[in-house]
Amino acid sequence: MPGIVLIGAQWGDEGKGKATDLIGTKVDYVARFNGGNNAGHTVVVGDESYALHLLPSGIISPTATPVIGNGVVVDPEVLLEEIEGLESRGIDCSRLLVSESAHVIAPYHRMIDKVTERFAGKKKIGTTGRGIGPAYADKINRVGIRIADLFHEDVLRDKVSNALHQKNQMLVKLYNRRAFDVEATVQELLEVGVKLKPYVANTSLILNNALDDGKTVLFEGGQATMLDIDHGTYPFVTSSNPTAGGACTGTGVGPTKIDRVIGVSKAYVTRVGEGPFPTELFDENGEWLRAQGHEYGVTTGRPRRCGWFDAVVNRYATQVNGLTDIVLTKLDVLTGLDEIPVCVAYDVNGVRYDDMPTDQSAFAAAKPIYGMMPGWSEDISQVHAFEDLPQTCQDYVKRLEELSGCRISAIGTGPQRDHIIEVHSLLD
């Protein structure tokens, strides 16, 4: 059975939680490989809605083992709160496995994230202020704390002391904030470590053994392609690699064990935070999409910026991820429009770009070149076969598939778990 990577093909919030839950009922492991609690996804099961931030979406499926890989940065308090919240609603979290090599978001990471963003002024990135970037920075600078360190008091104290020696000076002298007490920070981390210990494991070994034994593993990415630290709209990006390559480095599983890469795209586009967004709408159409799609961030509650489908972005996602399939979500949101614009290329200072400009100055200047598609008025939420969709709706999907350079294998037609059309099997 395969190793399957599921990633966002746009700027996030594409509906990966729903797609993961759909596939997760048929797989043995669901492994989160990047990011932290800056990523939010919602899974709807019947009348119940679950907003997840750090836990893999597969936690809702009773048959899958959820895994937090080494590429994730973990805020222990947030993780424990999320576990407690789900268990209070009857969800069994005892199956959860957390990599002992994952890095920890410490209290000082959150403070640094907030003050640096506040002082950035007009140059702010639009972070969630949850300490993700500073934790990854410590990881790269080799002064980070790993989950395994929470169980070795002397090691932990040494690492916290080393980190705070520099960070306290910055907080006090540059940002006029209070210094963190080393011992208080150590004790706080030790306490959460005790609670986390039952979940901690060598997840790389477990996942590799599972694949070798013929099990199916779903690798779940947080955020999305256009927020990738290397391939996204830098510097308005996240601090990790939400692209397909991150699935390997973020779990310790080699690329030869990946059989399928599925990208999730909305039938339109949204973005949260700062940064260029060529198809962004500033008129009543943008407000309409936001209202119809309930476009507010799961993690931040911020209203999302909305725009028409951008085929240049999707072609780029197909390229950098090696997509084999696309799950198209929220097609129902477009119901009622007479015409639907689709961005087929960019105009950059009079020059046509059919492909993504890697020069971010060019991308910031990109103006969308639209093709128009006829809309539909019928309710599609109860449609379960592609051929039963309105013809203009089918034509829209086929056009997006053609422009993206990748087949659309599943289509989301509403918020419920069963509001989806599986055109091609995502597991065969």
From Swiss-Prot:
GO process annotations (BP): 'de novo' AMP biosynthetic process; IMP metabolic process
Domain of life of the organism encoding this protein: Bacteria
Subcellular location: Cytoplasm
EC category name: ligase
Alphabetical UniProt keywords: Cytoplasm, GTP-binding, Ligase, Magnesium, Metal-binding, Nucleotide-binding, Purine biosynthesis
GO molecular function: adenylosuccinate synthase activity; GTP binding; magnesium ion binding
Free-text cofactor note: Binds 1 Mg(2+) ion per subunit.
Cofactor(s) required, per the database record: Mg(2+)
Residues that hold IMP according to the record: 13-16, 38-41, 128, 142, 223, 238, 302
Stored Gene3D superfamilies: Adenylosuccinate Synthetase, subunit A, domain 1, Adenylosuccinate Synthetase, subunit A, domain 2, Adenylosuccinate Synthetase, subunit A, domain 3
PROSITE patterns attached to this UniProt entry: ADENYLOSUCCIN_SYN_1, ADENYLOSUCCIN_SYN_2
TM annotation in the entry: none
CDD domains in alphabetical order: AdSS
Family (UniProt): Belongs to the adenylosuccinate synthetase family.
Subunit structure comment from the entry: Homodimer.
Name this protein carries in UniProt: Adenylosuccinate synthetase
Source organism of this protein record: Bifidobacterium animalis subsp. lactis (strain AD011)
The gene coding this protein: purA
